[in-house]
Amino acid sequence: MIILTNSSSLTLGPGQSATFDTVRLHTGCAECFRQGSGTVMLTARNAIYDISAGGNIGATAVGNANLTVFLNGSPMTEASMNSATAAVGDTNSVSRETGVRTCCCGNVSEAVTLRNNGETTIVLENPVLKIRRVA
């Protein structure tokens, strides 16, 4: 299991991934992470993982903000978090959870990122990414 967060707010333009500078907990070796990056590699083959993500998001302009968990560069639509911002500076708490089964073939790792999948720049406060191998 790994739990990541960041010690300061992040401003993410459309398409940018959150980076994490704080590892709250890391047990075992089923996930790899380089501090300061935004990617967690799921290294166990034919495994099942629970992925939880969230934080407080606000748009730098009035409109809809979107934060999404990506797997290997593709959005996981079931792990998409939307927030309607009525005024600049408003923040909303968002969170999602999903599951992933990794490939059983070859020496393949799955890459998990948390990305601004919207059309407006967002401010992300207290982000958290928790990944736990369950089988």
Regions found by a protein language model. Name each.
Residues 1-44, 48-135:
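Extracellular jelly-roll beta-sandwich "head" domains, especially the C-terminal globular C1q domain
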